[in-house]
Amino acid sequence: VWIKSPQDGQRVSSPVTLSFGNSNVAISPAGTERANSGHHHLLINLQELPAMDMPLPASAQVIHFGKGQTETTLELEPGVHSLQLLLGNHLHVPHARPVMSEKITITVE
């Protein structure tokens, strides 16, 4: 999985539209148990990854896309923000071999 837009290092204005990409894995809604599938979780400004053997907590820094969404628009405060995608299975638990994007940094002006 990866963040298609915005690009790493990009300067943007709020609201920010994010688009997610995937290959070799299917995007499915939460609750849909299917091999090689899951749904996106967006990690915002996390210094450390959450526990990888438990359901990901929903918070302002861990946004769940349980309907299988691949795009969203977010209001972000001005400043530098880190963004990373982490795929969770039907129960919101990361896969045994985590499926995640590179962390990118954007600046909201």
Residue ranges and their predicted role:
Residues 16-20, 70-72, 79-87:
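Short, well-structured beta-strand segments within conserved domains
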Residues 21-32, 93:
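Short amphipathic, basic-aromatic surface patches that mediate peripheral association
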Residues 14, 38, 77-79:
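A glycine-anchored, Pro-Gly-centered beta-turn/N-cap motif
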